[in-house]
C-alpha cells in the first residue's frame, strides 16, 4: 500500500508523528517526485503542520529533481512561517536558485540575510552564481558588502577576474588579499600567476613568486606549471627552464607546459629534445602534448617533424586527432607554402573543420597570393568576428581588389561588428602602460614621439624601408607611411627607450599579431640600440637581437637565426 493511500485511509493522528519519516523514505528510495506528491497529499488531506526538518527534505527533493517551481512555492511557505533565518534551510534554498541561474530570486533571498548573518558561506554561494555567468561586476557588488570575507571569497573573485580577462583587477584583488592579513593558498597563487602570465606582468609575477617562498606554500605540479608558464609568457624562458629542471618528478602537465612555452618562443629544436627526454623518462604524452609539438613545428617551419608527430600520435600512442591537432598541422603546411597538401588534409579530416582551420588556410592564401584557393576557402567561413572581416579585406586589398575590400568593411559596419583595436603595453617599475596606434593620450606623448621620430630616422639610415604595401587602404604613399610609423608596438618601444637606460632589455606585449613592418623595424632597432627587444604578440614571442629575430623571419619572411635555452 502506498503512503498516499495510507494518508487517505488512516486518521491523521496515525500519520502525523511519522510524516517526516514517510517523506524521508521516499527520498532515500530515490523518488524525490514522490516525496513532493506525498507532501502535497498531506497538506490536502490532513492538518499536518511541517517543521524545519520537513522543509529541508523538500528542498533536497527539489534539488534532486531540479524542480525550480516547487522551490519557489516552498520559498513562499517559508516566508509565511518565518523560517528564512534557519541556516539549514537558507543554504540549500540559495543553492537551488543559483544552480538554476535564478540570480534575481537569489539576491532577494540574500540581501535581507546580511541583517542577521555574517557567515561568508552564503556570500560565497552568491559569488559562485554570478561568476559562473561571467558577471564580475555583480559579483563584486556582493563581495564589497560581505560582512566577513574568507579565503574562499578572495579566491573566487581573483579566479573570476582571470576568467573574464580582468587581469589588472585580479592582481589588485590579490594585493588586497595579502594586505587583509589572510595567507594566500595554492589556489590563490595559481590564479594570480595565470593573470601575470596573460598580462605579461613580469615584475608582479616575480613578486608573487617571492611571496610563495616566504609563505612556504607547497609547490605541487599545478603551481610549478603556473610558474613555468608565467616566466615564459613574461619573456623569461630561461627561468622557466631552470624551474622545470629543478623538479625531480615531473607531472605530465608540467612537461606539457614546458613544451608549450618553448613552442611559443619558437624554439623548435629545444622542443624536439625535450620531447625525447619526456619519452625516455617514461611519461606518456597525451593530446595536449601533441598540440604543443605541432604548434612548435608550425612556428619553426618543421614540416617533416610535424608529419612524423602527427603519425606517431596515432600509431604509437593511439591518440585520435582532434580538431586542434588538424588545425596545427594545417597551419604548419600552409605556412610552408604547401597549400594543396593543407587543403587535401582539411578535406580528409575525420572531424568537421572549424573556422580556425579555414582561417589558417585563408591567411596562407593571402601570403602566397593563391586567390583561387582563397575564394574556395572564403566560402567555408561565415564571417563572425572582426578578425574574419579584416582577413578577408586584407586578401582583397593584397591583390588590389579595392572595391571588394571596401565592400567587406561596409558589410562589417552594417552588421555593427566592431574591429578589435591593436593594443601594445609595457611593464616598467611595476606599472603597466598601454598604447594604441597614433596614441596621444599619454602624459609623456611629446617625448615619446620625439624618441620615435629619432628611432625611425636611425632605422632608415640602416636600410629600413616602410612596408607600405601592408596598408590595406587605397591611400597615398605618404599616408601609408604615416599609418605604419605610429603603430602601437613602435610607441611602446619608444616609451621603453625613453624610460630605461642603455642596454636594458625591452619587453613589449601586443593583443594582435605583429605586422611585418614592425617586425622588420624592431630587428633594425635592436641593432641600432644594441638592445634585446622581446615582443610577445597574440601567437608567439619574437626575440630581436643584433638585427635578427628568433623566429628566423619564418613568421614573416625567411632567413635568420635561432637560439637555444636547453
Which stretches of residues belong to each language-model region?
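Terminal (and in a subset, N-terminal) low-complexity or junction segments at the ends
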Residues: 1-150, 159-566
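Short glycine- and Lys/Arg-enriched binding-loop motifs that mark or flank ligand-binding interfaces
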Residues: 156
